[in-house]
Each structure stands twice: as C-alpha cells, then as structure tokens.
Amino acid sequence: LKEEDSPLVQLGTDLFFDPILSGDQSLSCATCHHPLFAMTDGRVLSIGVGGVGLGVERFFGKELKVSDEYSLSGKEKIANPFIGLLIARNSPTIINSALLRTQFWDGRVEHKGRGDEVETLEPAVNSLGLKDPLAAQALFPIVSTAEMAGISFGPKVSHLVRDLVVKRLQENQHYSARFQEVFGTSSIQLHQVAHALAAFERKLIFNESPWDHYIEGETSSLTETQKRGALLFYGELKPEVNCSVCHSGDLQTDFDFHNLMVPQIGPGKGGGITGREDYGRANVTFDFRDQYKFRTPSLRNVGLTAPYFHNGAYQSLEQVIRHHADVIGSTLNYDPSVNVPATYYSSVLPAR
C-alpha cells in the first residue's frame, strides 16, 4: 500500500494546487506544472495571469478579475492588461527537481556548497536562511507580475507581495489551522510556506525507467534500436556524437550552463537592442561570458516534457538532435511562426 503523506506534504500539496497564492486567485502553481503534462504545461511559453484553461488550450481572457481585498480600481473586473504577454521561458518539469542543486533555467537559485544556505539574487529571500533550493525557488513565481502576482497586490516590491500572500493565508481559517497543526506556531511565516511547497515537490522523484533496469542487468528492458541509440548517445559508435559530455550521471546532466545557440523567441528578458534577448546565466553572474547560457536539463522523463530548450523553441526530440548536429544551419533556417506570435520573433526571422 502507498504510504500516507505527512501533514507537511499534504499542506504543500494543497498549496501547490490552490490559486490562493496568486494575486487575483485565478491560477496556481499547478497551472504551469500540471500532472496532465508531466508537471509542465505542455506549452512553448506559458500564459500566467490573465489566462484561462490549461496547457496548449490555455488562452488570454478578455477581462481580469482583481482580488477584492487589494483592488486598485474599485472594480471586480477590468480589461485584461496581460493579453499577449507570454512568460519569457518554457515551464520546466518539477519531476526530480529535488535532486538538482540549481533551480530555474538561469540557476538564480543555487546551492553552491559554501555553507548550508541557498544563494539567490534577492536579499529578502537570502535572509530567511533557507537550506533547500526547492524552498527558495517556491518564493519567486508568486512575486512575478506576469506569472502569478498580477496587479491585485499593486506596484509593491517582492518581499511586500510575499507578506500579503502570507497575510491572506493567515486570514484563511482553514490554512491558519493547518499551519498551526504542522509547524506549531500561531502565526504563519514565509519560510513555512516555502518548506511546505518544497515538501510536496520532494515527493515527485521518479527514478525507475527501462534504462535503469537495463544498467542493472535486465538487458531485455531496451529494444535493439534503443540500445544502438544508447551507444551513439555515449559516444561508443561515433566519438563525435557524444551526448553524455553534458548529459551524464544518474540524472543525465552536468549541472552546468551552456550556450547552444538556441533561437531567440518570446518576449525575452530585456537584453539586446529590442529588449527581447534573453542573456540567461549572465543575468545571474553578471559575466558577459555567460550570455545565452542556460542550465543543462536532466533527460529523465524527457519524452514527456516537450517542447524543449529554455524557450520551448523545438517541439520534438528529433528537432533538438538536429539542432545539436548543425547549430548554425538550424538557427538560420528556424521558423518561429510555428511556435509563437510574430510580435515575439525577437532577432529571429522566419525562414525565407
């Protein structure tokens, strides 16, 4: 029988699927990390605040509900100001994310091994003394205007938005009682919210696959085609084809950051002349040599988590492999109209 989840995990699970953490209470963490899509949203780029529905069927609503408690306009609904605003990066799966020492595509939440505490770019988060990258990571989407915060909380800095989320939970009798039961305190603390969400995500570890059975000696667990693919992947058939240089170990990642010349699509992160470039790791390290570098993803369950790369530029694993094989040709011939609205083509032009 399946072991019953602890009260902490149950609390984290409820928070993860509850829209109470978002500004207008219209979406939850699960909107972009849903079990139906292997804990992604199946989209190239996500629709956060102002969206309706799930996955590839999610669309921008005409109106935006403003939370009554923090309404700026005095109206319950306003014209949706987020129409057309896609999240800049592809929503990664959180399956096995508990095993990663860096979180986010740019690694802006990182456990560097110097001491026990996680380092981020935000002093308010660092001041919590969190030792779990998952816990620190959980505190960022709720303050992102386009992802979850919206405009219901007003133009407040991140730590004040988090304070309002905690206040909302405290005023909710159900959650107030749940937190007191789990943590034994009369008032809810921000770090408790973070630890509860992290506890749920730590349950999402899946490490049994045909490949695991194969390396344990069950040679029949892979087809002959898969075995030939593995020999190519590990550079045994062709040394020049050695995916394991970056995708190695149990998680098939080197935990590093690389510039793979992935076509720039989407709204970007403020880089370049148009502001639509995404400089990736350089936005964290402030080192120009890290421009366009992104975290090497784990290949665990990769067949379930399309589309691929930091901005969802490619829809299939075959396209990803072809890009690696001919980076320049693949980039020059890339047609972004397949994936995103023309407004967000960035520096990439449709193929002639």
Language model features with spans:
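Periplasmic c-type cytochrome electron-transfer domains
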Residues: L1-R352
